[in-house]
Every structure is written in C-alpha cells, then in structure tokens.
C-alpha cells in the first residue's frame, strides 16, 4: 500500500496531515509534482518530480499506482483512472470517490467546463475549512483501517 499525492494542487494543510499519517501508519507517501517540494525528513516520505506539462504528474501517478493504493487528488479524471486500476481516490476535502459516484462527478466537471468555455463565471471552490480537514483525516484513517483488515 502506497499513498500517492497529486502534489501540485494539494493544499499544504492536507500535506501536513499526510506527513503525520505516513509516519503513524508507516506507509510510503509519494508526492508527485512538476516542481521541487520540501518535505520533512522521513524514511516513509519522498517526492517524485516530473517534467512540467499538461497531465504529466497525473499520468505518472496512473502509471505507478497499484490496486490497494490511495491517491489524493481533486482531479476527477485522474480519480477515475486510478479507480479503474483498483486504487482508492480521496480528494482534499475528504470525499472518497467510488465507481458509483465518479461518473456523476465527471459529468458535472464536463458541464462546468462547457459553462466556462461559453463565458459563464462559475467561480472556484470554497476555502478549505477546519471541518474539511477533519473530514479528510477521518476518511484517511477509515481507508487505512479498511486495508488493515484485508491483510
């Protein structure tokens, strides 16, 4: 089991939760980004720097993740791809994507892209709240416990 992070867009507060979790769970945590990242010294935490470019980090995560891994991303197409490989996907707000919900999320994303392309101002996501952070940490623990039972 490995935790993969789409790190270019992952909020720092979520990365901090992940650093602590990697130590506590003693699981590999790999942050994939197209820029250099500073991470705490740990035998469980490492970075993987990829070339700049559209979806380069996403493609690397899809290539390397395996069934049973967890991918942290707000990128819905990336979440869909890792679900197809048997990995789990969790966004920084603590929403765990599933086969049952990912199609709806992809449809909504495509709809919002169409609105933006036609000039409609759709705005961005709300700021990450303390409740979002708690929900993320709880879902991360839930994933870990589920996978501990499978061993």
Curated annotation (Swiss-Prot):
InterPro entries: UPF0178. It comes from Salmonella paratyphi B (strain ATCC BAA-1250 / SPB7). This is UPF0178 protein YaiI. Belongs to the UPF0178 family. Pfam families: DUF188 (PF02639). Transmembrane segments: none annotated. It comes from the Bacteria. The gene is yaiI.
């Amino acid at each position: 089991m490995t935790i993969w992070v789409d790190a270019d867009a992952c909020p720092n507060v979520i990365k901090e939760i992940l650093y602590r979790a990697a130590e506590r769970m003693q699981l590999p945590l790999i942050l994939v980004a197209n820029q250099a990242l500073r991470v705490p010294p740990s035998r469980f935490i490492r970075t993987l720097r990829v070339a700049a470019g559209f979806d380069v980090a996403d493609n690397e995560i899809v290539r390397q993740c395996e069934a049973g891994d967890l991918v942290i991303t707000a990128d819905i197409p990336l979440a869909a791809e890792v679900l197809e490989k048997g990995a789990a996907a969790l966004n920084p707000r603590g929403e765990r994507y599933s086969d049952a919900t990912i199609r709806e999320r992809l449809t909504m994303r495509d709809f919002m892209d169409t609105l933006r392309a036609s000039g409609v101002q759709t705005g961005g996501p709300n700021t990450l709240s303390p409740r979002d952070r708690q929900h993320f940490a709880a879902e991360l623990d839930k994933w870990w416990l589920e996978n501990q039972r499978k061993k």
